[in-house]
A protein has these predicted regions:
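Sequence/structural signature of beta-propeller domains
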Residues: 21-577
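Positively charged n-region of N-terminal signal peptides that target proteins for export
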Residues: 1-4
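Bacterial N-terminal signal peptides
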Residues: 6-16
């Protein structure tokens, strides 16, 4: 084992099973109007979350015990309950699906809906805006209206719809005129298509001074590079970064890119001895990547694409296919059990799976390359975040797991990440060998982690994406959790986490879910709302202030998207702001 020491950890949670609780609306709810934008309700929770400069909880034990009666409870899957947030914060609506795009193109006319009903059966396609990137520029970026001042503060996001009609938008935060509030960056071509699908992740690369977006589209996915000027230049990087179901993407202070893949694996029976048992356990199939560019200021100049490899008991943990020799793949292996055992750490390192100096710049399948090289697969890791102030030596990532109670209710599978998990990776300095450790093993109560963002240097926010199947099985909607990152020791689960947001369900999402549950012919949209696009940033476009460098996030702005249904983007603000 390496002698490297993990400098801080998250608290593993007890593997308890949640009994669905009655829908309880948090006390202290209020609603109002802020700058012409609707603010949702907010509630209390048992433990206040501070985003002040030092991040310390200044309350005494009696105050904390008193708050135990004010916990924020999850919403049941019934009706359209409000979305609630812990005390001290409120939600301000920034944009919603029905908002107009100032430069419509083909079927792309609204922020969150395509203009395809009719003839599209049932209803218009929802475009599912996803990961947000907040940026502040010193100059007006310009737009389709000449000489118009679009401001200096912007929020960018990709949209996850398919059919070659996914697109990228820019919300002009300083603009109040609805006619110029939202700008389309990727208009359709002569055939009425953008030829993009499932645009999910987004980030700003301060070295290239460009935006990067990912397409979570399996072997047809990849990375899109977009300039911030007007009109923007758009190109793909398939010959350099490969094609895969990429989702999270994050630069470090050297210009390297951390890329997270979400590609669901083959499902197998939850009971290997019973062929009639549900096929709900997914074989680990997705990888954690790092791209080391030859020139940080020009990604097209090539470089090395690497993938994470962990050693369990001194042996590399590699992909095992589901086939005649391995009918359950690696789903039930001892190695997967060890990997997901809280309190353990495992040596890990980066292995090169593609080098443009050797392999050229032809398009390639990154997932296949990672498997061939012996990288370690995970159960759909969707996003990652660097620990603020860690010098980019530490990052967290979150496999979503199986999103199915048929799998999670099997103890052998729950112990192997069926409910989802959060891992931590440490590479101190320029060390070639790091440590991988599981810091949250999901449960029925805290499950299916999809999105991560640091609220401050010690509080990690994790959004759930359970999906309609798991929502129905447990009669619970999603939440956003806050986990305490603490240096040097474990804490009890009581003090390590709390529910930060209890997601509700808007009326459009309720209708979608009813149609989907009924199997309405031609229905093509998602059902229940999902929290996504968690993003906390001061908006700096500078290399010297790259997101993750500073430990102090006191001046950062906070955003998230209530995806599906009305497709609402919210800003999270302090209640007194």
């Amino acid at each position: 084992m390496s002698r490297l020491i993990v400098m801080s950890i998250l608290i593993p949670l007890a593997a308890t099973t949640l009994q669905p609780a009655p829908a309880v609306r948090a006390r202290g709810a209020a609603s109002g109007i802020m700058q012409g934008v609707v603010s949702t309700t907010r509630g209390n929770a048992r433990q206040r979350i501070d985003d002040d400069k030092d991040g310390r909880d200044k309350r005494n034990k009696d105050d904390r015990d008193k708050d135990d009666d004010d916990a924020l409870f999850p919403n049941q899957r019934a009706g359209h309950p409000d979305t609630t947030i812990v005390e001290k914060y409120s939600l301000v609506k920034i944009a919603q699906g029905s908002d107009p795009i100032e430069n419509p193109s083909g079927l792309i006319t609204k922020f969150g809906y395509l203009n395809d009903f009719p003839p599209r059966p049932v209803e218009a396609t929802k475009t599912e805006p996803d990961e947000n990137t907040y940026l502040v520029f010193k100059q007006n970026l310009g737009g389709p209206t000449p000489h118009y001042d679009y401001g200096r503060h912007f929020l960018f996001q990709g949209h996850e719809n398919g059919s070659d009609l996914a697109y990228i938008t820019r919300i002009n935060l300083d603009v109040t005129d609805p006619a110029h509030r939202i700008t389309l960056l990727t208009p359709v071509g002569s055939d009425g298509k953008t030829h993009f699908n499932s645009i999910d992740g987004s980030t700003w690369d301060p070295f290239t001074q460009t935006l990067l977006f990912t397409q979570e589209n399996g072997s047809n996915g990849g990375v899109i590079e977009v300039t911030s000027d007007w009109p923007p230049t758009v190109r793909t990087l398939d010959g350099v970064l490969g094609k895969a179901g990429y989702e999270g993407i994050h630069p470090d202070d050297k210009g390297n890119l951390l890329i997270i893949e979400d590609s669901g694996g083959t499902t197998v029976n939850v009971d290997p001895s019973n062929p009639n048992s549900p096929k709900a356990a997914r074989n680990p199939n997705s990888f954690v990547y790092r791209f080391v560019p030859n020139d940080p200021e020009d990604l097209s100049a090539g470089g090395k694409l690497q993938a994470l490899q962990a050693l369990i008991g001194g042996e590399p943990l590699k992909f095992v296919p589901v086939d005649a020799t391995h009918p359950t793949g690696d789903v039930f292996s001892n190695a997967q059990l060890h990997l997901h055992t809280p309190g353990t750490t495992w040596p890990t390192h980066w292995i090169t799976i593609h080098d443009t100096a050797v392999n050229g710049i032809a398009t390639f399948d990154a997932n296949a390359a990672a498997k061939a090289a012996g990288a370690t697969p995970f159960k759909r890791p969707e996003n990652a975040q660097f620990l603020p102030g860690s010098g980019f030596d530490t990052f967290f990532f979150c496999p979503t797991g199986d999103t199915n109670a048929d799998s999670g209710n099997q103890p052998a599978l729950a112990a192997r990440g069926a409910w989802g998990s959060i891992f931590r990776v440490d590479f101190p300095g320029d060390a070639e060998t790091g440590l991988l450790s599981i810091v949250v093993l999901g449960t029925a109560e805290q499950a299916s982690f999809d999105n991560l963002a640091f609220l401050n240097s010690h509080t990690l926010l994790a959004a759930e994406d359970r999906g309609d199947t798991l929502h129905k099985q447990l009669n619970l909607l999603d939440s956003v959790w806050a986990f305490n990152v603490h240096s040097g020791s474990f804490h009890s689960s009581r003090s390590s986490s709390q529910r930060f947001i209890a997601l509700g369900r808007d009326p459009q999402s309720e209708l979608d879910a009813m149609l989907r549950d009924a199997g309405t012919p031609g229905f093509q949209n998602e059902g229940d709302n999902e929290p996504t696009g968690l993003h906390v940033s001061d908006g700096s476009a500078s290399v010297h202030k790259i997101l993750g460098k500073a430990a102090n996030l006191n001046k950062a702005r906070k955003f998230f998207t209530q995806q599906h249904g009305e497709n609402i983007v919210y800003e999270i603000v302090r209640a007194h702001d």
